[in-house]
Design a protein with these regions (language model features):
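Flexible glycine-rich active-site/ligand-binding loops centered on an Asp-His dyad
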Residues: 74
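Conserved GNAT acetyl-CoA-binding A-motif
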Residues: 100-113, 118, 285-296
Length: 359
């Protein structure tokens, strides 16, 4: 076997192709997703493991930088093809070696471990991980990069068609899906920059009205378009009388589709387009031959309750996050500064505003 680190596009393309059809894969380590952190001044790289010129594993790492502090973060993984789980320990050793090379004070990785049969192909179980990781602790001390911690699974069971599957949904869900289609929505897929920007405005508006944050379109645009152009995602748009009333952004990876974000126009009566958007994603998933759909973790209490209506099985990975402190002095200094800033947040915000005005 051969392993090497790379940022060359040819190898990044091969890495992405591997993740797309690898059950343990995640969109969080697609090269385009890793590149999106460059807008924050972060760097990235990919470790690839080859056997007879075939990619069988690796990991995607983000090198996060804050002042003079550096952190080496793997949002999901290491990832290996089934049958090569014994290589995980050696890949974890590579995380430490590589992080030290970059003078990082801290390294972190997140493994999808679960005993749930319903997602057994998408996860590792403890019997696959043959040894403990030396000098590695359970937990997550760096919280500025989203890392996988579970999967919110909509299983298609033995359904042979969307019609079979919808019959297993509750009466309420079936009714609301039918109500959404009664408004004769036009279902399209945003493809161009202009189409995506217009559709994404609804996501930004929902975030503003709901008092939560999403990345701006300008910040995420490059990632969006690259994923679309390489057929790794879907941006579903529902229009009524030519106006955008509902949107949903979904990424294809690991032999399933994951819901990333979406938005609907608030109308009276409710157009029920949230149900329609997810139903369209489920139909695409079934058409691709997938066995389930990841409606995604998290959200407000209302969003979580809405997702649960699709007969979800919310699976939290078992102690997913692991970390290594590589330079205790520097890392403790970082923690201290974080505490100081958190306790004096209003002061630092005012200071930042003053500096901007003076400029």
């Amino acid at each position: 076997m051969k392993l090497f680190f790379t940022k060359e596009q040819e190898w990044l393309d091969r890495w992405d192709a591997f993740l797309l059809t690898e059950n343990h894969g995640s969109h969080l380590i697609y090269s385009d997703w890793l590149k999106s952190y460059e807008s924050y001044g972060f760097d990235f790289e990919v470790l690839i493991v080859l056997k007879k010129d075939k990619v069988i594993g690796g990991f995607g790492a983000i090198i996060a930088k804050k002042l003079f502090f550096k952190f080496y973060i793997i949002p999901h993984g290491p990832v290996v093809t089934s049958g090569y789980e014994r290589q995980i320990s050696s890949l974890v050793a590579q995380i430490k070696i590589r992080a030290k090379k970059y003078n990082c004070c801290y390294a972190q990785f997140s493994l999808p471990i679960s005993q749930e049969k319903i997602v057994e192909k998408q996860v590792y179980n403890h019997s696959m991980i043959t040894s403990d990781f030396p000098e590695v602790f359970s937990g997550k001390k760096f919280k500025y990069i989203y890392c996988s911690y579970g999967i919110n699974w909509v299983s298609f069971y033995d359904s042979l068609s969307p019609h079979d599957f919808i019959e297993k949904m509750s009466v309420q869900v079936r009714r609301n899906i039918k109500l959404a289609y009664k408004n004769s929505p036009e279902i399209t897929f945003a493809k161009s920059d202009d189409e995506c920007e217009k559709a994404y405005k609804l996501i930004e508006e929902n975030a503003k009205n709901g008092n939560y944050s999403v990345r701006s379109y300008s910040d995420f645009k490059k990632t969006f378009l690259s994923l679309l152009n390489t057929d790794k995602c879907y941006f579903i748009v529902a229009k009524i009388n030519g106006e955008i009333k509902g949107v949903g952004f979904f990424v294809k990876c690991g032999n399933y589709i994951t819901y990333i974000s979406g938005g609907t126009s608030k109308e009276k009566p409710d157009l029920k387009l949230g149900y329609l958007i997810h139903w369209e994603a489920i139909k695409i998933s079934m058409r691709l031959g997938y066995v389930g759909y990841n409606i995604s973790m998290g959200g407000s209490p209302g969003v979580i309750a809405f997702k649960s209506k699709f007969n979800t099985k919310t699976i939290y990975f078992e102690e997913p996050h692991h970390f290594m402190i590589l330079n205790p002095f520097v890392f403790n200094l970082y923690k201290l500064l974080n505490i100081v800033v958190a306790k004096n947040k209003s002061y630092f915000n005012k200071l930042g505003s003053t500096i901007k005005i003076k400029k």
